[in-house]
């Protein structure tokens, strides 16, 4: 919702922003980690006029989503009430706060936790790996019941054996339920003596 408000008010926002407000907003967005230091310096360094800085700032905040835009709107409403009134942000802020359809987050405090791009990419990769591994386990357990040599070879050659399979498959191996046809594999995984060839 807040991102839609900023998109609608973009042109008026660019023409109305003052030097002090843009600098304060940049500091606020850095402090709340909407922008990182590099992004803030880029906005300041590469744009000579206040309008250019405002344009660059708004164009970097809007793609970051509703929570980032909400922080921007809240700062303007609290620090520059005249600008907020000019842009019609006071009413928009109230509408956003009253809207129960605002997206919630997964943080324990009930707020969205903003992070750096590198952290977001790392988390995304971890989730993708988890999904891939879970799908692989299911496929392998289904295919291995046929006892094919190809499956045994694939299982032994996988990079996951050293780190992942030792932890995930140890319990089923102890029970002898999933992979009974690979002699000694449970012991090798347990002691870490299995070597990839």
Swiss-Prot record:
Domain of life: Eukaryota
Cysteines joined through disulfide linkages: none
Induction, as annotated: Down-regulated in patients suffering of Huntington disease.
GO molecular-function terms, A-Z: CARD domain binding; caspase binding; cysteine-type endopeptidase activity; cysteine-type endopeptidase inhibitor activity; identical protein binding; kinase binding
Record Pfam families: CARD
Tissue-specificity statement: Widely expressed. Expressed at higher level in placenta, spleen, lymph node and bone marrow. Weakly or not expressed in thymus.
Keyword Zinc-finger: no
Gene3D superfamilies associated with the record: Death Domain, Fas
Signal peptide (residue range): none
InterPro entries attached to this UniProt entry: CARD, DEATH-like_dom_sf, Pept_C14
Keywords, in A-Z order: Protease inhibitor, Thiol protease inhibitor
GO CC, any one term: protease inhibitor complex
GO biological process: cellular response to lipopolysaccharide; negative regulation of interleukin-1 beta production; negative regulation of lipopolysaccharide-mediated signaling pathway; negative regulation of protein binding; negative regulation of tumor necrosis factor-mediated signaling pathway; positive regulation of canonical NF-kappaB signal transduction; positive regulation of NF-kappaB transcription factor activity; proteolysis
PROSITE patterns documented for this protein: CARD
Residue ranges of domain CARD in the record: 1-91
SUPFAM superfamilies registered for this protein in UniProt: DEATH domain (SSF47986)
Known role: Caspase inhibitor. Acts as a regulator of procaspase-1/CASP1 activation implicated in the regulation of the proteolytic maturation of pro-interleukin-1 beta (IL1B) and its release during inflammation. Inhibits the release of IL1B in response to LPS in monocytes. Also induces NF-kappa-B activation during the pro-inflammatory cytokine response. Also able to inhibit CASP1-mediated neuronal cell death, TNF-alpha, hypoxia-, UV-, and staurosporine-mediated cell death but not ER stress-mediated cell death.
Assembly information from the UniProt record: Homooligomer. Interacts with CASP1, CASP4, CARD8 and RIPK2.
Protein name as annotated: Caspase recruitment domain-containing protein 16
Lineage: Eukaryota, Metazoa, Chordata, Craniata, Vertebrata
Gene: CARD16
